Amino acid sequence: TWSGDGHNTPLEMIRAAKARGLKYIAITDHASPLGMLKGIKPHNYKKYIADIRAAAKKVPGIRVLVGAEVDILPDGKIYLPNYVLKELDWTVASVHTAFKQSKEKITQRIVRAMRNPHISAIGHLTARIVGRREPTLLDVPAALAAAKETNTALEINASWYRLDLNDLHCRMAKSADVKLVMSTDSHDEDAFDFAFGLGTARRGWIEARDVLNTLPFERFVKEMKK
């Protein structure tokens, strides 16, 4: 992949998604200032988009959204400039650094990211890694209110080491009428597995109708607009 964080090409991922029966997929490689990741940058984003669109044309029967998972910087700014973000079909903003900020700072950080009109969703909201990293001190109710206000979706990350949103946060999000999406966080072609995410969502009383990417593609595209 572009960032080096994944293990298969976009074409291989698209083919694997189709083989799993998916009707559409979002390719969201990393855009990050972290030195260990190459990723999407202002100088190469046009080639990134062109490469994925070219791969998508080779696999009929599945729709492909060209996206990115973009770092939320410690001050809440988004790593990529808006002129890049607006060219993407689907943009997830996530925290990958500065996990120990105060409750006030991390909440302001997430809310500021949500207010960017080009951000489609917030990924793994509390940034926890099961058994390895505690959640941030985020004020979750405040974040849910901002998500509702800004029409920003929240991710139910189905990876077994994320499960973020957790079940309680899923229930809170549903009560707050916040849009939800479920992702597999796939980093290779064998990782298209929603099982853990489905279990988490069901414990949070989430139904299929509560998750945007259960919708047909055209309705999903309409609903995801801010």
Tell me what each language-model feature is.
Residues 27, 68-69:
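Core AdoMet radical
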